[in-house]
C-alpha cells in the first residue's frame, strides 16, 4: 500500500554483492531497492544494509563500494581517493601475508610467531625455511627494507594519476588482465573482496596469537577441534571454574 511519505520499489538493475557471484562487468544480478518519494526523488538502497539509503557520496562506481561509510570518512573526495588507495595496498599485503603464515606451518616448517624470534637475539641470524639468509642480520635487513620501500614509495608519489597508483599495469600486469575492460572491472571487485577477507584473517591470527602466545593458527585450530569446550576464546576471557573443570 502506498503511503503519503513515499513509494517503495525494487529495480532489477544489478549491483555488487558480497555474497553473489560477479558478472563480467563486476556487478551481481541481485536487485536493489529504491525509494520513490512524492517529490520524485529516487534513492538507492545500500547493499550492505538493505532498506537503508545509500550515502550520497557513495555512488557504487568504485570496486567494493557497497554504501558502507557510517563514520562519513569518504565525504571529502580527496580523502576518499586516498582511502581507496590505502585499502587496496593493505589488501595486497594481507593476501601475501595470509598464505605466508599458513603454508610454512602446514608444511611443518614452524609458525609465523617463532620465525621472527631470531631478531631478538644479539647475534641473531635470519633464516628462510630453515636456511640461513645472506646478510641475514637485523641491521642489514632493516637497511635493505628501508631502501626498497623508499624507492617504491617515491615512484608511487610521483605518479599523479590516481588509477595508475592503484593499478599501475605494465610490468605489474604480465598476463594482460587489464586489456579487457569488462574483465578488468570484475577482477578489481574480486581483488577487493578477497583482500578484505585476508585483512580480517590476519587480524584473527593476531588475536589468536595474543590469546595463545607462541602458537600458529593451524596449531591453535587443531587444539580447538580436539576439545572445543575448553579450548576457545572463552577459556581466556572467562575463568574456567565458572563453567566446569
UniProtKB/Swiss-Prot annotation:
Q: Which Pfam families match?
A: Chloroa_b-bind
Positions contributing to chlorophyll a 3 binding: 129, 191
Per its UniProt record, what Gene3D superfamilies does this chain match? Answer: Chlorophyll a/b binding protein domain
Q: Where does chlorophyll b 3 bind?
A: 153
Inducing factors: By light.
Membrane-spanning intervals of the chain: 93-113, 132-152
Give the record's PTM text: Photoregulated by reversible phosphorylation of its threonine residues.
- Which residues does the record give as chlorophyll a 4 binding sites? 194
Q: Give binding positions for chlorophyll a 5.
A: 190, 208
* Predominant location: plastid
Binding residues annotated for chlorophyll a 6, in chain numbering: 224
> Which annotated residues bind chlorophyll a 1?
68, 87, 196
Which residues bind chlorophyll a 2 per the record?
A: 90
| UniProt membrane topology term | Multi-pass membrane protein
Keyword field: Chlorophyll, Chloroplast, Chromophore, Magnesium, Membrane, Metal-binding, Phosphoprotein, Photosynthesis, Photosystem I, Photosystem II, Plastid, Thylakoid, Transit peptide, Transmembrane, Transmembrane helix
Q: Which GO terms describe its biological process?
A: photosynthesis, light harvesting
Which residues of this UniProt protein bind chlorophyll b 1?
A: 48
Cite the cofactor comment.
Binds at least 14 chlorophylls (8 Chl-a and 6 Chl-b) and carotenoids such as lutein and neoxanthin.
Q: Which domain of life is it from?
A: Eukaryota
Q: Which GO terms describe its molecular function?
A: chlorophyll binding; metal ion binding
Q: How is this protein organized at the quaternary level?
A: The LHC complex consists of chlorophyll a-b binding proteins.
Family in the record: Belongs to the light-harvesting chlorophyll a/b-binding (LHC) protein family.
Function of this protein?
The light-harvesting complex (LHC) functions as a light receptor, it captures and delivers excitation energy to photosystems with which it is closely associated.
Its name, as the record gives it, is: Chlorophyll a-b binding protein 1B-21, chloroplastic
Amino acid at each position: 500500500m502506498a503511503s503519503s511519505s513515499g513509494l517503495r520499489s525494487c529495480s532489477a538493475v544489478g549491483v555488487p554483492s558480497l555474497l553473489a557471484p560477479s558478472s563480467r562487468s563486476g556487478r551481481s544480478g541481485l536487485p536493489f531497492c529504491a525509494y520513490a518519494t512524492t517529490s520524485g526523488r529516487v534513492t538507492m538502497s545500500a547493499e550492505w544494509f538493505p532498506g537503508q539509503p545509500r550515502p550520497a557520496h557513495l555512488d557504487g562506481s568504485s570496486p567494493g563500494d557497497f554504501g558502507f561509510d557510517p563514520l562519513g570518512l569518504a565525504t571529502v573526495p580527496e580523502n576518499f581517493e586516498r582511502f581507496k588507495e590505502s585499502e587496496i595496498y593493505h589488501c595486497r599485503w594481507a593476501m601475501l601475508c595470509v598464505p605466508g603464515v599458513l603454508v610454512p606451518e602446514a608444511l611443518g616448517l614452524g609458525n609465523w610467531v617463532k620465525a621472527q624470534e631470531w631478531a631478538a637475539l644479539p647475534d641473531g641470524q635470519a633464516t628462510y625455511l630453515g636456511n640461513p639468509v645472506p646478510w641475514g642480520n637485523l641491521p642489514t635487513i632493516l637497511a635493505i627494507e628501508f631502501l626498497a620501500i623508499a624507492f617504491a614509495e617515491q615512484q608511487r608519489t610521483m605518479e599523479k594519476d590516481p588509477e595508475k597508483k592503484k593499478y599501475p599495469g605494465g610490468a605489474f600486469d604480465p598476463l594482460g588482465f587489464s586489456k579487457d575492460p569488462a574483465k578488468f572491472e570484475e577482477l578489481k571487485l574480486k581483488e577487493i573482496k578477497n583482500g578484505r577477507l585476508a585483512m580480517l584473517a590476519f587480524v584473527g591470527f593476531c588475536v589468536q596469537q595474543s590469546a595463545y602466545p607462541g602458537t600458529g593458527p593451524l596449531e591453535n585450530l587443531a587444539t580447538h577441534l580436539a576439545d572445543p569446550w575448553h579450548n576457545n576464546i572463552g577459556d581466556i576471557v572467562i575463568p574456567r571454574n565458572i563453567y566446569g573443570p
